UniProtKB/Swiss-Prot annotation:
Its main location: cytoplasm. Residues 637-656 are annotated as: Disordered. Pfam families: GIDA (PF01134), GIDA_C_1st (PF21680), SAM_GIDA_C (PF13932). Gene3D superfamilies: FAD/NAD(P)-binding domain, GidA associated domain, C-terminal subdomain, tRNA uridine 5-carboxymethylaminomethyl modification enzyme MnmG/GidA. Belongs to the MnmG family. Homodimer. Heterotetramer of two MnmE and two MnmG subunits. GO terms for cellular component: cytosol. It is found in: Cytoplasm. One of its GO terms (biological process) is tRNA wobble uridine modification. SUPFAM superfamilies: FAD/NAD(P)-binding domain. This is tRNA uridine 5-carboxymethylaminomethyl modification enzyme MnmG. GO terms for molecular function: flavin adenine dinucleotide binding. The lineage of its organism: Bacteria, Pseudomonadati, Pseudomonadota, Betaproteobacteria, Burkholderiales. The gene is mnmG. It comes from Burkholderia ambifaria (strain MC40-6).
């Protein structure tokens, strides 16, 4: 058998973006090759050992709803699960899990090795094969030429990566891995707009040298234990472990200030911009000089290691300063550092040069996903990877690209922000970035996306069957609550007072009672001695049962707000999705200022909605664009009719 070198899709990179891209492309039926410099690091958690969080957990749930791997792998490797913002409204509740690094990698690799249509090969990529304006393949470090109609590039921090510890620096993609210098140089030859960003990681600590008696324990949620995947079960989780909390102090801060003269960030050695929402400890001390203390979370890296990740002290200070600052904190006085913290600078490419499909505008068939687009975080990378892999598969199948709208998914918000606004610093997802977050909750990610995923070919039969049962049960139970009534005669005053605070004075549906503050689904079902409960169990599986009850309760309690948001979405929909012609020259649009026409010509938005979110493009400019499109459409129709009349056939071609 000859060694295969012809594929439909090539994915370069085996991190969180690359693995989801390869799996999505292969699920689409495309013959897919995943190229990685080291098969042992597939799915590696390069920085913190956690998945999810505010906004990020929403992305993980959406990836799961579309058949992706991250949530399921976390359920198999998570050693602590928590629901953040559990006391707040459902829009901002988010799941977060600590993961065992080794188990997580194993779960991802198992899925890759057992995915039909997917080949793995260990080789770094040094070059892309480009013919004219389209990519046709990739060339590896030892000169193997793989051909494909689409290439998804997910290079993470490896593109011309430079690692900094104090004033010492060296090339690297992350600690222990080489940088992709040749590939970075090749991309620069393609004249794609690029820049430099920076991220960092803290020193790792040997747990045997930590005095836990001086620390505050932070356990996970135990009743119930959360799961990430809609198909997940708490029984899949390995042993659960606590995290621990310590704090910086004035001595810590003095040590850090004393080392700033050897900090690559504060001596101008690092030029790349770092993440605003995950700053280094030296940045925190500088920016929040009046703050006396910062909370530091000591997170276990896994069940088979003593290594701990001190979340909150990412740093590129010299190692002697790192050692001193760690020892200044309570419980860490004798801590042994296993690995030094460091910062890494790397190339990224302006995401405004991408289509919403994550295909580059300049080179057909070339897709970017993950940190190469200026984002930070495993979850943002995984979401982009799935979308890029899906659209690479659709590209080779000559199908239209797909991207969710802003009102449809956090993934839609993420991509729209990237391709219309670009990034000045590493982009992190928050719930505050979404205008319609009440409709984009974690709990309904499957309701929003799984049917679409099924149509796209991403969702398998097992997921579809489970989703269909849940969807139908939610619908039936919602209708039952709306059509089941209690009256002052049928609901004893004592029972009504116990649940509602007073007896009822007229007829109510169970749905109306559930809308009252402080009333739960279980409470309503307990009325009349349990007669208000459904006649048959909503589901046999306890996890699915809780999901159904949650969906029903939120849907009824927030019905008015959700309907109001849906009306707002409908009003905005017409302009949002109006497409702009590919070849339009905005200098010819009557009334547009020079600045606006210049920005529109530079960024080439695909829709009116995207154009409206470009900085400096005013509502008045959007109105002028709409007028121009109407005039242009009328002119094309008139021109086509006149041409048809001259030809004597009396037909008018349909305008696309």
């Amino acid at each position: 058998m000859l060694f295969p070198t012809e594929f439909d899709v090539i994915v370069v990179g085996g991190g969180h973006a690359g693995t989801e891209a390869a799996l999505a492309s292969a699920r689409m039926g495309a013959k897919t090759l995943l190229l990685t410099h080291n098969i042992e690091t597939l799915g590696q958690m390069s920085c913190n050992p956690s998945i999810g969080g505010i906004g990020k957990g929403h992305l993980v749930k959406e990836v799961d709803a579309l058949g992706g791997a991250m949530a399921a792998a976390t359920d198999e490797s998570g050693i602590q699960f928590r629901i953040l913002n559990s006391s707040k409204g459902p829009a901002v509740r988010a799941t977060r899990a600590q993961a065992d690094r080794i188990l997580y990698k194993a779960a991802i690799r198992h899925r890759l090795e057992n995915q039909p249509n997917l080949w793995l090969f260990q080789q770094a990529v040094d070059d892309l094969m480009v013919e004219g304006d389209r990519v046709v393949g990739a060339v590896t470090q030892i000169g193997i030429r793989f051909r494909a109609r689409a290439v998804v590039l997910t290079a993470g921090t490896f593109l011309d990566g430079k690692i900094h510890v104090g004033l010492n620096n060296y090339t690297g993609g992350r600690a222990g891995d080489p940088a992709a210098v040749s590939l970075s140089a090749r991309l620069k030859e393609l004249k794609l707009p690029q820049g430099r960003l920076k991220t960092g990681t803290p020193p790792r600590i040997d747990g045997r040298s930590i005095d836990f008696s001086k620390l505050d324990e932070q356990p996970g949620d135990l009743d119930p234990i959360p799961v990430f995947s809609f198909l997940g079960r708490a029984e899949q989780h390995p042993q659960q472990l606590p995290c621990w909390v310590t704090h910086t102090n004035e001595r810590t801060h003095d040590i850090i200030r004393g080392g700033l003269d050897r900090s690559p960030m504060y001596t101008g050695v690092i030029e790349g911009v770092g993440p605003r929402y995950c700053p280094s400890i030296e940045d925190k001390i500088h920016r929040f000089a009046s703050k006396e203390s910062h909370q530091i979370f000591l997170e276990p890296e896994g069940l088979t290691t003593n290594e701990f990740y001190p979340n909150g002290i990412s740093t590129s200070l010299p190692f002697d300063v790192q050692l001193e600052l760690v020892h200044s904190m309570r419980g860490l006085e004798n801590a042994h550092i296993l690995r030094p913290g460091y910062a890494i600078e790397y190339d990224y490419f302006d995401p405004r040069a991408l289509k919403a499909s994550l295909e580059t505008k300049a080179i057909n068939g070339l897709f970017f996903a993950g940190q190469i687009n200026g984002t930070t975080g495993y979850e943002e990378a995984a979401a982009q990877g799935l979308l890029a892999g899906l659209n690479a598969g659709r590209y080779v199948q000559e199908k239209d690209a797909w991207c969710p709208r802003r009102d449809q998914a956090y993934l839609g918000v993420l991509v729209d922000d990237l391709v219309t606004r670009g990034v000045a610093e590493p982009y992190r997802m928050f719930t505050s970035r979404a205008e319609y977050r009440l409709s984009l909750r974690e709990d309904n990610a499957d309701m929003r996306l799984t049917e679409i995923g099924r149509e796209l070919g991403l969702v398998d039969d097992a997921r579809w069957d489970a989703f269909s049962r849940k969807r139908d049960a939610v619908s039936r139970e919602t209708e039952r609550l709306k059509s089941t009534w209690v009256t002052p005669k049928t609901l004893p005053p004592k029972e009504a007072t116990a649940l509602l605070g007073k007896a009822i004075d007229h007829e109510y549906s169970l749905a109306e009672l559930l809308r009252r503050p402080g009333i739960s689904y279980d409470g309503v079902c307990s009325l009349k001695g349990g007669e208000c409960a459904p006649a048959e169990p909503l589901a046999d599986d306890p996890v699915l049962l809780e999901q159904i009850k949650e969906q029903v309760e939120i849907g009824i309690k927030y019905q008015g707000y959700i309907e109001r948001q849906a009306s707002e979405i409908e009003r905005n929909d017409a302009n949002e999705n109006t497409r702009l012609p590919d070849g339009i020259d905005y200098r010819e649009v009557r009334g547009l200022s020079f600045e606006v026409s210049q920005k529109l010509n530079e960024f080439r938005p695909e829709t009116i909605g995207q154009a409206s979110r470009i900085s400096g493009v005013t509502p008045a400019a959007i109105s002028l664009l709409m007028v121009h499109l109407k005039r242009r459409g009328l002119g094309r129709r008139n021109g086509a009719a006149a041409e048809a009349t001259e030809q004597g056939d009396g037909t008018v071609p349909t305008q696309q």
